Amino acid sequence: MPNLCTALEGIQKSCDNNSGGIYQVWYVPQDSIDVVTTNTTYPDYEVTAITLSPAAPTTQFTSFFVRRNTSNYTEETAADLINGSTFVTQTINLVFHRREMAKSNALKILGSGQQYLSAVVLDANGKYWYFPYMQLTATGEGSGVARADGSKYTVTTVAENEQLAMEVNLLNPAAYTLLGLV
């Protein structure tokens, strides 16, 4: 007896160039998010609007710039066939060069209180991706060994969500600036 909860959807062959890595990530406390509007009609599956609460202490996303070829995100789906549960572990790995007190403080605030964060990632293909309910789970690195190593921070934020990250395609182009996503 077939048990198809949702009709299958195909993946078309793409002729577009494909690049790895990320250019930038923005975070905002999850509590600052008022509404996330999505289009879940095939083939779009995208975030079309993000509204931040006017009462929130943070009214824009905060930018974290990363250097090329240093940072990435991964998404791994785990399905328990016995319990019938499925979730996606989303991990954003960031590297920040040159250790200094301002960066140390920014990372301390990012992880304070083990708060939930919403993240938007700009990948090397020029696409924005939305990751809700992230938490800072690790920071590391240090001075390096050789002079050429340079000092750096590594930062990991992780979430467990029900679906893969959704592409952000805001219907109002000015909204990117209003949200600080530039």
Residue spans of the language-model regions?
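Short, acidic/charged, Gly/Pro-enriched secondary-structure junctions
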Residues: 107-130
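Oligomerization/assembly interface segments of phage tail-like spikes and tubes
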Residues: 80-101, 149-164
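Solvent-exposed edge beta-strands and adjacent loop segments
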Residues: 2-6, 11-89, 135-147
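Charged, amphipathic alpha-helical segments
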Residues: 2-9, 87-109
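Short acidic, glycine/tyrosine-flanked loop/strand segments centered on an H-E-D-like triad
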Residues: 89-96, 123-142
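Generic structural motif
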Residues: 30-32, 97-101, 124-125, 136, ...
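Mixed-charge, glycine-accented linear interaction segment located at domain edges/termini
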Residues: 134-182
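Short, hydrophobic/proline-enriched secondary-structure or compact coil segments at domain edges
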Residues: 22-31, 92-97, 114-122
